[in-house]
Amino acid sequence: MIKSLNISAIYSSPINRAMQTAEIVGKHCDVKPILDDRLIELDMGKFTMMPYDEIFASHGNVFLKFYEGSLEISHNGVESFSEVQKRVFDIVDFVKNKHKGENVVLVTHMDPIKAMIGKVLSLKSEILFQLIIANASLNVFKYDDQNFYLSSINSMNSSRFHESF
């Protein structure tokens, strides 16, 4: 099924779980994944490896603060949401220029996906915080030479969208 989507390139976060997904997709469409650091997950700064309960107890809801752009987040070494959006759209711009009119897969993580969705749909921080991105789900964005559109979110079956590619 995936081979018929004519995937011309796969770009992946270098984080292991993303690379594994990219390799699986690549085997099915005969495309070798390209690793790109712009697709990595959010850098949690001093909160890296801390249990969520500890983070919330000492700093409140840091995830909502992250989407709101709170200075408390950056003071703790956490990458800001605007920084995540900038690096995500940096690779998206690169891909859309290099692969004009082609189907390209980006294998990434929740916050980079939310960065793209948030910008495309102009979502507020409260909505982004509540939005769940399912593991291994397909989120389809289309570009018409002027604008991006969200065609699918959290899809687990690409056959439903096969005709739209």
Residue ranges and their predicted role:
Residues 31-34, 42-54, 97-102, 118-165:
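Acidic, low-complexity terminal tails and accessory targeting/binding regions
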